[in-house]
Amino acid sequence: MARDVDNKQNAKRISRDEDEDEFAGESMVGRTLDNPFLGEDEFEDIFGSESQYISSSGQNSTNPFLADTRIENSPLGSESKANQLNKQGTNVNHIEIPLRDFNDPTQPESFLPPPKNTFTSRIKKIKNLFKKEKKQVKPEDLGPRQIILNDYSANHFLHNAVSTCKYSAFTFLPKFLKEQFSKYANLFFLFTAVVQQIPGITPVNRYTTIGPMLIVLSVSGIKEIMEDIKRKKQDQELNESPCYVLQGTGFVEKQWKDVVVGDIVKIVSETFFPADLVLLSSSEPEGLCYIETANLDGETNLKIKQALPETAGLLKPVELGQLSGEVKSEQPNNNLYTFDATLKLLPSDRELPLSPDQLLLRGAQLRNTPWVYGIVVFTGHESKLMKNTTETPIKRTSVEKQVNSQILFLLCIFVFLCFASSLGALIHRSVYGSALSYVKYTSNRAGMFFKGLLTFWILYSNLVPISLFVTFELVRYIQAQLISSDLDMYNEETDTPAACRTSSLVEELGQVGYIFSDKTGTLTRNQMEFRQCTIAGVAYADVIPEDRQFTSEDLDSDMYIYDFDTLKENLKHSENASLIHQFLLVLSICHTVIPEYDESTNSIKYQASSPDEGALVKGAASIGYKFLARKPHLVTVSIFGKDESYELLHICEFNSTRKRMSIVFRCPDGKIRLYVKGADTVIMERLASDNPYLQTTIHHLEDYATVGLRTLCIAMREVPEDEYQRWSTVFETAASSLVDRAQKLMDAAEEIEKDLILLGATAIEDRLQDGVPDTISTLQTAGIKIWVLTGDRQETAINIGMSCKLIDEDMGLVIVNEETKEATAESVMAKLSSIYRNEATTGNVESMALVIDGVSLTYALDFSLERRFFELASLCRAVICCRVSPLQKALIVKMVKRNTGEVLLAIGDGANDVPMIQAAHVGVGISGMEGLQAVRSSDFSISQFCYLKKLLLVHGSWCYQRLSKLILYSFYKNIALYMTQFWYAFCNAFSGQVIFESWSISLYNVLFTVLPPVVIGIFDQFVSAGQLFQYPQLYQLGQRSEFFNLKRFWSWITNGFYHSLLLFLCSIAVFYYDGPNKDGLASGHWVWGTTLYAAILATVLGKAALISNHWTQYTVIATLGSFLLWIVFMPIYAVAAPAIGFSKEYYGIIPHLYGNLKFWASLLVLPTIALMRDFVWKYSSRMYYPEEYHYVQEIQKYNVTDYRPRIVGFHKAIRKIRQMQRMRKQRGYAFSQGEEDQSRILDAYDTTHTRGAYGEMR
């Protein structure tokens, strides 16, 4: 019953179609349905009746969610398929929606809600009139796919090679050019380069713009190609993975890319499926096999698949090679957990139905099964996993977007200057035209104005620094290499370095406000270990904390913990020895684990679909209760070397509603006993009135919960024979019922699960990745909000949240776990009201953590509730979303993206994390044990979560600060030089005359000032890495955009204007009374212009030195070296250029320049005057208005000892006291047993039989 309810609720999931252009900031966004099986009643449950939708004219309009949504239009095409989906059990109940966001071209537009009647929507409608509609072909319209067995020539389908590359040989140029010319600056330079080719317009050489622009585009293109080559290599590594394919009567090794539809492949344990397969047979009884789908849905427990009975006996390659027949399947689609197909084996005409029970998805891993045979049905990009991936998105950083917007404002100033200069030329002509008859002005004033406009456009075009973009890309690439070569983020154990796959996002790492993290494989190792237990009120552990070790001074205290050796002694001599025996017996026989003898190691290997059960069985075996063998109705266990067999009578299965599993055994002494394990809440409700160890056990459970251990309560009762016989009849009747069987079985279990005796509880550790608690704590201190999105259950998620310190003892838990939309809305609103009431009463908001499950999240993401849900989530320091599907992970990220302007980072290690990683501004992949799908789709990859701390706090902060300074400095230095052209226009009758020689203007950016921004962008450190770790609060400078914002940008622009005007006026003053030189000639225009050029160069290089925080030899080379380069270059160029006819402006200038005292005095005095204001400003701001990092710079400079370690002990003591006072209701229950048909597993295996010649279990 609960399972059916869960499926129905999850069938109502909806998704968003994000349109950032039209709907950004609006509360209503487009939606489409992720599940094709919704009827009209279900639509009304979610969206209300049709009458709620009113057209703009005031008339009732058709509900857009009901149009064209008949079952026959669904991807599967029949109502029976919806029913079949609900029969699959809860292994699909929370992941039935596909991974991809629903910008699905196959869905009718009528799914979308009515758009607002805005100007934007009208424009879009007009554009749509001129668009040529493409007819979209739906998969169901193509008919079934026909696959012929063992006839490769008859099957012509897509190859199995996959690619995650951004470009191909054909798409590189159009895609790259589209991306580059989406930047306003590049469009501006393109237009300028075109105008510059018009004869008689340009005042400078016609190639001074197009040349640098081609260099910029070339460098950017080379960088993109190199990064895409890396992606191609990773794709190649996957495509060349080995697998075994049937050829004739034997299997040969082939590469994944060579697998084709119709192949029969052999997959061995611990390997991934290379394509979507139909299971034919396996080494296990009745064609069973275990698969791990953590790479797909994040679930830690194993799933069970079963071959058809007609094919389960095909164990020999010869038999497989003789197969003839066909598979008719649905066309490739993105529905992961539905599959409709039939198998016909000749000579029979019977068509055998295939379902998801026989479907093995690409990306899943075979576990605890030696081998399986399967038929390939979908390959490559037609596999269901790849159908759910989207094209690698093109991401742009916040800084880049700000630069783009500020360039627009700068262009407005530029256009104003052009118009002002052109207008000035007309005014000057009107006033002085008659006195300047030799100029020969044209009579066409309008033509003169527009010609002047284009001339000044070219003359002032360098106000926007073209070199910025090539420098920007170059520095980004080098920063990416520094990240990839950081040995602190190198995992020696797995030989895995960090990798930057998208260098264009490095500065985004310094502004992250939210982190969305997967749990399994990212925060945890998914390795369960039996750590502690409490039996009859006594606590035991494998490792005992120092403050809890037993002393003889207080024998009766329940504060102490004993080791497992003491547990073994108490089995022999304690008065509670019988309870200890029964406790360990439950661990060793009450489970679905399959034992298998390993001849190579002469030991037993346990195959467990639940990692929790595996840990408990191994824990019991380590104490002396070793599980040996299983038959369909018999379990054998060795107790300290003595074998005992227990007859399994009935099993009451575990599910998420019952939260417990119970098995009825007939024990060797002839008595019937019921053994139960489950959550503390459900076990304690069913205890007998006399349980002396209840309170002590509760106290121990709370202790386990505070350290993040996963707990289960263990209980039992003896069942009288007559009671058992009566109950057995009730249970068998319920098991054979055709109507509401699940509820009747649960009711039957309730009748016998009563008057239990509490034996104790277990505590299992889900091992965290190294350094996870410290990393999370540090990142939270840095002001980053962390959301954990996991497919696991609520209890498991809370448990991990505690152990990894995402949830600490100071936090209150806000839990939203509802079944309907109305209940979810009420819960969210009630919790918001409570928080605001508390704030009004106490004056502050308590530190809280929000926990929400997948069903509630479906409704919380609805547009009517989204804002309120985000408001609640934003008030919480941490958020845990459990039982979420891959698509929901992406929708959560997009929801936060719509409601906040902060940078979002998503981190995960499985294919189920790919939508989330692609939806976030920054995607980080963990190169772990769940494959490399997440890594291939990510922007950065690391091998452990703990490396995220340095990636963000150090590399992120440095990259953001460095690139911000690089951008600001690049704009400043261009304005400082090129604005002098505008000031000079007032002195030359707005004629368009230039101050500087043409190629000197171009070389200013390309040669003489290129090194300072590069060196600053690569080597500058506003504080050291150690200080960034010690003071993670400094990371908030990036979150607040302190280093690059509107105020700071325009202060630099203003400073550039100031320096250009000051130096221009001072240079005029220096040469105003210029007398003749030794040769009797005046210095002239080019001497004055070159002196001004050198003074500006010295000033901007001095400015670079002034803003450098971290001096290296490269800083000296970039500043002093660049100026010395100009001093050496100038005489060589002035002699060589006129001699070869390249440029004649500098002919004969060197004697007048280098022999002129005014020139050398100007190089010393003018930059000093210009930079004096900057020096005074820097001194006063640091002394009287210091920022946070200024204090840290002083601490770093003078090596001041940090005072904070002195109070660490005090804080630890306070936390320990709070731990003792809190979490009295949360007792750490968590259990990852899959809700499979557990009886089927127990009935299928007889492990006393040996395996056959092909490894099959007979």
UniProtKB/Swiss-Prot annotation:
SS bond partners: none
Membrane topology (Cytoplasmic): 1-183, 230-406, 473-974, 1020-1051, 1108-1115, 1170-1258
Keywords assigned by UniProt, alphabetized: ATP-binding, Endoplasmic reticulum, Golgi apparatus, Lipid-binding, Magnesium, Membrane, Metal-binding, Nucleotide-binding, Phosphoprotein, Translocase, Transmembrane, Transmembrane helix
Top EC group: translocase
Coiled-coil residues: none
Positions in the Lumenal compartment: 205-208, 428-451, 996-998, 1073-1086, 1137-1148
Catalytic activity: ATP + H2O + phospholipidSide 1 = ADP + phosphate + phospholipidSide 2; a 1,2-diacyl-sn-glycero-3-phospho-L-serine(out) + ATP + H2O = a 1,2-diacyl-sn-glycero-3-phospho-L-serine(in) + ADP + phosphate + H(+); a 1,2-diacyl-sn-glycero-3-phosphoethanolamine(out) + ATP + H2O = a 1,2-diacyl-sn-glycero-3-phosphoethanolamine(in) + ADP + phosphate + H(+)
CDD domains: P-type_ATPase_APLT_Dnf-like
Positions of transmembrane segments: 184-204, 209-229, 407-427, 452-472, 975-995, 999-1019, 1052-1072, 1087-1107, 1116-1136, 1149-1169
Assigned protein family: Belongs to the cation transport ATPase (P-type) (TC 3.A.3) family. Type IV subfamily.
NCBIfam families the UniProt entry points to: ATPase-Plipid, ATPase_P-type
Protein name: Phospholipid-transporting ATPase C887.12
Taxonomic source organism: Schizosaccharomyces pombe (strain 972 / ATCC 24843) (Fission yeast)
Organism ancestry: Eukaryota, Fungi, Dikarya, Ascomycota, Taphrinomycotina
